[in-house]
């Protein structure tokens, strides 16, 4: 056993003999003259080459020798791959595997404190940041405090990981010359630095550096005599580089770098060493490690004798990706490239018109590879594209092995948690309530009954002009449905959601407890089922663990608003991922660029190669600009691009590669990745028939693009629809219509057919928004109430009386304060001219009835006409004036005579006494009362016998539609400004035919007869 005691804080020393075996066989020559660094060429399967090199250096007579090797890998996935390769060789020993990010196994008893709970620290810092933002509101919104705290934690962690003194940045001479914005940023950095110093907490990056320092002391004093290897890392972090330097100098230590480009010449290496902007080159990471270890990058020995599988392609790509200062070498070195045929033989290039077609083409190629028994890997950082490819593969019931899984926020438990969080402190909307009730994890105990209630509530209440759902409204719906179970169900919903409504500002832990209780109660259902599916399966377990961690840290959250709380929950959930529980296809994989470094496939598909996607543009740093980072020794934004370029260079070195990109994404034109531009530009200018080679690459890619477009194109020519004019049996035609729908019968008979023959009615909107129709309805009610209350005489101040009634009705009809204010202003502008015109009307007639309903049976055609007169006035001699309120533009008299017969038919109903509780009316005139102040009232007086002629015209219209051969033509007389988009235009397939096309009658009586037994 090894015991370590602290010396000078983090310094460690041995107290007993090292546990490592002393009879280890040497893997390398003892006492190296310089640090050992090896490389593996581009295109070589790195884990396989690593294992081959280890076994080649061991005594085959000592199978246990590998067990004495300490192997430090870059990632868990690489460790897993090595284990799989060793197991595939049969029974044997495994090396002692560790990871760069987890060194505790190398110093099990190190006196290094554990890293602090990052979530609790972030919540505490968010409080401090929020307080600082209150003093300077212009810097950022207070609701962004949690995200700003996360950014500060990351930069402090980076400072610790790179071993930079924070005071060097805060008190930097460069910073003194920067803008006022930096002075604000410095205040935040000082805040975090003071918090870290006072709390004594250490971040994960700081702990990692302390472990490396402890390991350095331990191995410097007592160097291990067994082999120690660090493999697969490019030293992108300062702590990792320090560990690599330590291992490379051990007597039996070595560093093995992946993806070394052995075609880079001295000129390029020299350029990379002296160029100002050099970190975006794919081999800069190799150069940086080599320089820090005192090694010339061009002299790095190979770990094995394996050569690159496609040296010609490596040379081509290496030349294409040379730094900008030496791209003139394309002209000198390009013509000397050999074996261009071999370089591009397995390379295909596909440019799709859209990301959807790109995803389908990729899915087709992956399906073909699986059919041929090949291992295929889709490599891309674009998670939207990977989801599209996954969806496309489901066409053939193929589930890919996605290394990234699904974000927890997109899983069923994550979505439910987010949906409920969005309800805290907000008014419940109909759409939010329906989405919540239809969530698959809500009320899983009695799901069938729950879905029936949800559907009925939506159709009977939420879609019936319900601006804001209320408990009273839901209870009224339940009473109408006459079911105790529905009332219990409604009470359960509101018992879950009511505690969330009136929350303003509260302690984070209180808000979290209220939130989680609502989520659990919704999942349990009215019966309080404890065994709900919310926390079950992988996604549920991950959600439970994440929310438990948030609960543990919640006491550090302080006082937050609902918006701030929601952003915290969203941020925490988005950082976690869940693996798909469905067993995937073993040979169809989706990798990120990091996974592609340590695994191999027969076919690599490099997708989403657009600039800003691959490579991804560095995110703006709100704290330090590039000059300050450079002066402090922190990583530059270009380093991330360089690492991404290194991943691309390794992936394109595979034997068979398909490169894809989409020309447009979400309707926006894209730019090809800079690496693709370089390769295509180089090929275009090569004299070795490079232009034709590029054309061959495109042709191979276009094969899959053509397949994708073919699979999306319907087979055979689909005939265009004709302008419909269905002729249903007369018995199926409507025998009753209202006066307002007669215009529809004249203008668009097909709409009458769809609504009254087929029984198709569009669903009402789920969320009611204030629009012109709703405003017109409200004004209609206001005027009706005004007339009812002033029948006998106008009050002394009629305008004030109108505004008083308007305030009462708008409070009910317009629950939105801003809308209510706008409509009140509209009413105030309308009130004065309306009162003046009302005074004129009452000089020759007085209000008699409002909302006068009636129906008229025309026995000659067996048809019932229904209608409602908004207002009927009587003159002193008993003659009637019929008015109809119109919120839109009033139709001209010509339109009323030919098409809009509403007022004329109301006059007909009045003349024959069709209105309820009313005798026959001697109708003198009709008019529209415009709710628009710009329109004046225009009375239409009827001549003797004119109303009777209106009745005869109506009978002729109905008789015409009672003719079996008369079809219900679509858009017979379309409204001038209607265009496309009427509720039944899609059913009529308008757009496949034009308004000038003749109608095609379709006799439906034969279909009716065929259905009869």
PLM regions: where:
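RecB-family 4Fe-4S metal-dependent nuclease core
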Residues: 525-527, 667, 716-1013
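Polyanion-engaging groove/track-forming segments
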Residues: 2, 6-793, 803, 807-813, ...
């Amino acid at each position: 056993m090894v015991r370590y005691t602290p010396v000078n804080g983090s310094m460690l020393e041995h107290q007993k003999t090292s546990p490592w075996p002393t009879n280890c066989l040497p893997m390398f020559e003892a006492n190296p003259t310089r640090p050992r660094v090896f490389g593996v060429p581009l295109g070589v399967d790195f884990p396989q080459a690593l294992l081959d090199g280890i076994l080649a250096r061991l005594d085959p007579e000592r199978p246990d020798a590998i067990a004495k090797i300490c192997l430090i890998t870059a990632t868990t996935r690489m460790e897993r791959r090595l284990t799989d390769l060793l197991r595939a060789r049969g029974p044997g020993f495994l090396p002692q595997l560790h990871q760069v990010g987890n060194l505790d196994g190398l110093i099990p008893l190190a006196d290094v404190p554990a890293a602090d709970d990052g979530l609790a620290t972030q919540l505490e810092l968010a409080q401090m940041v929020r307080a600082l933002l209150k003093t300077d509101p212009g810097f950022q919104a207070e609701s962004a405090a949690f995200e700003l705290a996360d950014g500060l934690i990351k930069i402090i962690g980076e400072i610790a990981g790179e071993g930079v003194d924070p005071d060097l940045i805060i008190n930097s001479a460069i910073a003194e010359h920067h803008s006022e914005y930096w002075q604000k940023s410095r205040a935040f950095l000082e805040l975090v630095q003071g918090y870290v110093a006072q709390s004594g907490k250490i971040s994960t990056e700081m702990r990692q550096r302390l472990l490396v320092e402890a390991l350095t002391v331990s191995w410097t004093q007592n160097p291990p005599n067994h082999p120690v290897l660090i493999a697969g890392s490019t030293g992108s972090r300062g702590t990792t580089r320090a560990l690599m330097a330590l291992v490379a100098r051990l007597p039996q230590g070595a560093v093995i770098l992946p993806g070394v480009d052995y075609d880079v010449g001295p000129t390029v290496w020299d350029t990379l060493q002296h160029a100002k902007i050099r970190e975006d080159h794919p081999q800069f990471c190799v150069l940086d490690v080599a320089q820090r270890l005192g090694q010339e990058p061009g002299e790095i020995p190979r770990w094995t004798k394996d050569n690159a599988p496609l040296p010609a392609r490596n040379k081509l790509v290496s030349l294409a990706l040379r730094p900008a200062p030496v791209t003139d070498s394309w002209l000198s070195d390009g013509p000397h490239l050999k074996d261009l045929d071999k370089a591009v033989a397995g390379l295909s290039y596909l440019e799709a018109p859209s990301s959807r077609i790109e995803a389908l083409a990729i899915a087709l190629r992956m399906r073909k590879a699986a059919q041929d028994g090949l291992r295929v890997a889709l490599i891309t950082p674009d998670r939207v594209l990977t989801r599209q490819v996954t969806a496309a593969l489901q066409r053939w019931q193929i589930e890919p092995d996605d290394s990234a899984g699904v974000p927890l926020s997109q899983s069923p438990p994550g979505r439910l948690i987010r949906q409920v969080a969005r309800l805290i402190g907000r008014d419940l909307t109909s759409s939010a309530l329906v989405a919540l009730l239809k969530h698959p994890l809500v009320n899983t105990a009695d799901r069938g009954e729950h879905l029936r209630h949800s559907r009925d509530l939506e159709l009977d209440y939420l879609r019936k002009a319900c601006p804001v759902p209320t408990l009273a409204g839901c209870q009224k719906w339940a009473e109408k449905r006459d079911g105790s179970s529905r009332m219990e169900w409604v009470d359960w919903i509101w018992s879950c959601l009511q505690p969330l409504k009136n929350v303003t500002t509260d302690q984070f832990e209180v808000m979290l407890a209220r939130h989680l209780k609502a989520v659990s109660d919704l999942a349990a259902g009215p019966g309080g089922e404890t065994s709900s599916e919310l926390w079950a399966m992988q996604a549920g377990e991950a959600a439970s663990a994440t929310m438990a961690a948030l609960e543990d840290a919640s006491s550090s959250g302080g006082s937050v608003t609902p918006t701030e709380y929601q952003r915290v929950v969203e941020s925490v959930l988005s950082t976690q991922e869940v693996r798909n529980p469905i067993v995937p296809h073993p040979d169809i994989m989706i990798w990120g660029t990091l996974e592609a470094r340590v695994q191999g496939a027969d076919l690599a598909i490099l997708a989403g190669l657009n600039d800003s996607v691959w490579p991804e543009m560095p995110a703006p740093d709100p704290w330090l600009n590039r000059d300050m980072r450079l002066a402090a020794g922190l990583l530059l934004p270009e380093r991330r691009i360089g690492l991404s370029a290194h991943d691309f260079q390794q992936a394109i070195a595979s034997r068979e590669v398909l490169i894809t990109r989409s020309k447009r994404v979400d309707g926006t034109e894209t730019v090809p990745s800079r690496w693709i531009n370089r390769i295509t530009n180089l090929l275009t200018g090569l004299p070795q028939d490079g232009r034709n080679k590029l054309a061959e690459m495109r042709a191979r890619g276009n094969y899959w693009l053509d397949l994708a477009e073919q699979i999306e194109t319907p087979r055979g020519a689909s005939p265009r629809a004709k302008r419909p004019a269905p002729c249903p049996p007369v018995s199926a035609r409507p025998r009753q219509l209202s006066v307002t729908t007669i215009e529809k019968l004249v203008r668009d008979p097909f709409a009458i057919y769809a609504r009254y023959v087929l029984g198709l009615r569009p669903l009402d909107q789920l969320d009611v928004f204030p629009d012109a129709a709703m405003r017109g309805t409200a004004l209609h009610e206001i005027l009706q109430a005004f007339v009812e209350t002033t029948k006998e005489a106008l009050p002394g101040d009629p305008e004030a009386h109108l505004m008083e009634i308007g305030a009462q009705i708008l409070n009910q009809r317009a629950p939105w304060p801003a809308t209510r204010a706008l409509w009140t202003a509209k009413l105030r502008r309308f009130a004065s001219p309306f009162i003046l015109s009302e005074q004129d009307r009452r000089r020759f007639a007085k209000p008699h009835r409002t909302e006068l309903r009636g129906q008229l049976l025309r026995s000659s055609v067996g048809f019932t006409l229904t209608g409602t007169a908004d207002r009927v006035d009587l003159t002193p001699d008993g003659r009637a004036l019929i008015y109809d309120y119109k919120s839109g533009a009033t139709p001209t008299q010509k339109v009323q005579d030919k098409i809009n017969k509403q007022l004329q038919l109301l006059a007909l109903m009045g003349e024959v006494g069709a209105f309820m509780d009313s005798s026959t009316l001697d109708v003198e005139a009709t008019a529209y009362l415009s709710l628009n102040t710009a329109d004046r009232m225009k009375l239409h007086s009827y001549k003797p016998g004119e109303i009777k002629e209106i009745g005869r015209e109506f009978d002729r219209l109905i008789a015409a539609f009672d003719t079996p051969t008369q079809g219900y033509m679509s858009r017979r007389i379309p409204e001038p400004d209607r265009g496309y988009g009427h509720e039944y235009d899609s059913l009529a397939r308008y757009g496949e035919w034009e308004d000038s096309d003749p109608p095609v009658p379709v006799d439906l009586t034969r279909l009716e007869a065929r259905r009869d037994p």
